[in-house]
Regions:
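Catalytic cores of phosphodiester-bond-cleaving enzymes
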Residues: 1, 8, 84, 88-91, ...
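Beta-strand-connecting loop/turn residues
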Residues: 20, 32, 99-101
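Histidine-centered nuclease catalytic patch
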Residues: 24-71, 77
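Long, low-complexity, intrinsically disordered segments enriched in glycines and aromatic residues
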Residues: 67-124
Length: 184
C-alpha cells in the first residue's frame, strides 16, 4: 500500500480488530507505538504482501539493543513452527506463570517454544509487565467463582473495545484458578 491515507486506514482497522493490543505480546499499542507486521515476511513470499490475513499490528518492540515481537522476528519464519496470531488455538498453546513468564502449555509443543524464542516473548520488560498486569487486575485476590467469572467476562469483552494489556496472561491465571477451584 503506497498511499499514506490507505496505509493509515489499514493500520486503524488492524488496531481496532486487535482491540489495541500487539499481535504477539498483547501489550497496549496505538497508532504511534505500532507498525504493520507481515506475518510471512515479504522476503519469503511477496505475494502475501497485501494479503489482509498476513497483516497485523505489532508493537515497536525495541529497547536499545533488546528487541521483541515483530522487530525480533525480522525476516525469520518457519512455516511449520511459528504460531500465527490468527490460529484459533493460539491462546491455548501458551501458559503464564505468576512471575510473568510465558511457556508452552504443552512442554512438547515445539511451535510454541519456537514462537516464544523467536519473538523474545520472555524479554525481562515483558515478563515484569505481565506480572504487574496480573497483580493490578486482582487475579490473585479473586474470591470465589462469581468474582472470577465477572473478571473473566470483563477482561474478555471490554465495554470500550480496548482489551487490557496482557489480558491473555490475566485470563490464563483466572481460568487456571477457576479450574483449580472446580476440582476441589
Amino acid at each position: 500500500i503506497k498511499s499514506k491515507p490507505e496505509k493509515q486506514q489499514l493500520k486503524e482497522a488492524l488496531l481496532h480488530e486487535q482491540k489495541y493490543l500487539c499481535c504477539y505480546c498483547c501489550n497496549r499499542i496505538s497508532d504511534d507505538s505500532s507498525h504493520i507486521e507481515h506475518f510471512v515476511p515479504q522476503s519469503k513470499d511477496s505475494g502475501l504482501s497485501l494479503e489482509y490475513s498476513n497483516l497485523h499490528a505489532s508493537c515497536q518492540g525495541e529497547n536499545g539493543d533488546m528487541k521483541h515481537c515483530g522487530h525480533a522476528k525480522g525476516n525469520d519464519y518457519d512455516k511449520a513452527l511459528l504460531i500465527s496470531p490468527l490460529d484459533k488455538n493460539c491462546e491455548k498453546r501458551f501458559a503464564y506463570s505468576v512471575n510473568g513468564k510465558i511457556e508452552p502449555s504443552d512442554l512438547s509443543d515445539q511451535g510454541a517454544e519456537y514462537t516464544i524464542k523467536l519473538l523474545a516473548l520472555n524479554d525481562e520488560r515483558l515478563k515484569k509487565a505481565r506480572e504487574e498486569a496480573m497483580w493490578t487486575a486482582g487475579v490473585f485476590y479473586a474470591q470465589g467463582e462469581k468474582e472470577r467469572e465477572t473478571l473473566i467476562k470483563q477482561y474478555s469483552n471490554p465495554a470500550d473495545g480496548k482489551r487490557v494489556p496482557f489480558c491473555n496472561a490475566i485470563l490464563y491465571q483466572l481460568r487456571k484458578d477457576q479450574e483449580s477451584a472446580g476440582s476441589k
